[in-house]
């Protein structure tokens, strides 16, 4: 009887634990639920990470809304947002400006946000895309899904002098991020400096991207807030 009760209590604990993420540096932190969450920008859709879904989180636990000419994002679970009409082919550059109004206001350590390109089969269990994201502490990461997660510059990313640092928690910090496809190269630029460059063949391969052609959008880690402006694509 005692054994059966212990097993039941154990199962209750397993199924009531909130979604948990391991962030940069290995910190463990539960994803929040954002009040008034969901997507209110016409034409836009999104998908939270599979591990967030497995923990019981929903897309409605994060928020995407219009704020002036920009997009206001508050997470919640880690999420990628896109408009299916935003497609890029051939050589192109996608860029946007990300302003974190209050650095680390929803977390106790830095969390990243940035751009996503090369999106294919988005919203399905076979989705693939690449993203470059900045932290307000001067670090950046280049990662993707194919459909399993993959990393291009290590598990903890890398620092670069081009990445702006917030003066401290609660202070604003802004990053201009761009992802470019140029011939056989894919590059990430932050604040007008190329911080990472890869051969296209290293990205368009089994377990990574299906193509560099695809949908572009924005990518946010969990428990993060920023305003995105100037999301544009240019062709050479």
Regions found by a protein language model. Name each.
Residues 75-151:
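Secretory/extracellular carbohydrate-interaction modules
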Residues 96, 170-203:
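Carbohydrate-binding surfaces in secreted/extracellular proteins
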Residues 198-229:
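Flexible glycan-contacting loops in extracellular carbohydrate-active proteins
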Residues 6-16:
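Bacterial N-terminal signal peptides
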Residues 150-176:
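Short, aromatic/His-centered strand-loop micro-motif at the edge of beta-sheets
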Residues 25-106:
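Low-complexity, Ser/Thr/Pro/Gly-rich disordered linker/stalk regions
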Residues 80-86, 161-169, 218:
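Beta-strand-rich interaction surfaces with strong enrichment in secreted/lumenal proteins
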Residues 96, 229-233:
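Extracellular beta-strand elements of beta-rich domains used
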